[in-house]
Each structure stands twice: as structure tokens, then as C-alpha cells.
Amino acid sequence: MAATILYPGRNWLTIDGEVVVINTLDEEIDGKSNPNDPSGVDNASKTGLTWAKYLGTGPTYYADMWNANANTIMFRYAETLLSFAEAKNELDGPCDSVYVALNKIRFRAGMPSVDKGKYSTKETLRELIRRERTVELAGEGFRRADILRWKDNNGKVLAETVLNGELKRYVGTVNYDETVPEKRAVISEDTELVEKRVFVSHNRYLPIPQEYIDLNSKLVQNPGY
């Protein structure tokens, strides 16, 4: 998670070369308004969590937002391996080529190989592949398409479950006396509602912009819009 998410209490090296502690929990810090407090500003993460993935640290990255030296990833070999593993498992069930594909990704991240005994059926391996895909490709634009094509054991599209419900954020404070970043956030049992999300079946498709319908009378708007 630390390679993917910026969380409260984590150390971060700014473009000025200063090490700061991420704090999206406290409304005030040392008597001053916290610019990263989700409840007090519009340009901060509403959940208190944000992406660390692909962000370079220190003064050599993003010093000029129009001339950054961070390389944009256009194609991910890991996504190819995950797609192969998913398709192969659905076609033939567990086999060596599926495990090999998954292990290439896991070994790169310093993770152990897949436990073949634990993931020995098409169903259990499917769940593992979905989890690996969720973790590996987090924040890269694949998630919506994945949960629109994946179904649960009852044949229900996962998006109808995952995208319906309340989105909440943690409540608490950051303990600056704690030296271990993972232990700095003191989380309350309470949570705050960010928004209530609603997903219905027609949301599977996006609306056609009205300007294009105006240009072509034969275009028919997608249902529900």
C-alpha cells in the first residue's frame, strides 16, 4: 500500500527537498488551518487518501509542472500478464502458464509465489487474479471497466455492488511524536460521510454529448440520459 497510497502520517519529500508528514486528519496544525484538511478546502482529497503511485519525490521532480521529467507509462507488461492469466483461467482453469504469469508480477514486487494448493480451482484462482489486478493496476484507469465486466457468484455485475453506497473518510489525528509513519495516524471509531454514490444499470454506458447529437440527428442518446 505504501507504494500506492499517500496516507496520514507518512513521510513525504517535497519539491523543496523538505521532509514533511502527510496530515489529512487534523483541521489545524500548530494553531493554523491545515491546507490538506479534506473538510476545509476544495482542492484536497475528500477521503484523506491520495495517490503516491508514479509520483517522484524531491526537487528534481515536477519543479516545473510544464516540463516534468517523469516518464509517462503508455503500456504495462503487467497488464498483459494479468489479462492473459484471467483469460487462460476462464478458458482452461488453473494451469502452469497462469501461475507463471502471476508469479512474474509477484516476484518483481518481492512477493512469494502463488500458493497452488490454496488457489487450485478456477473459482479461487479467479478471485486471486482479480485481487492481483486490483492491487497492481490501482489508479491506472482499469478499475471501472473491470468491475463492469466482472460478476459475482450470483451473476450480478460487481459495479452494481461496489459503486453503490456511502463513501466515508476516517476521523482522527496525527501523532507527530511517533517515529514510525505507519503508527502516526490515531484513527477514531467514527467516520464522516463524503458522499452517497448511486450506480444503476444504465450507468454502464456514458451519455453521448449533446453537441454530437445536435450535429447528427441519427445519433440516439443512450438509455437513462
Where do the model's predicted regions map?
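Acidic/polar-rich alpha-helix caps and helix-coil junctions
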Residues: A2-Y225
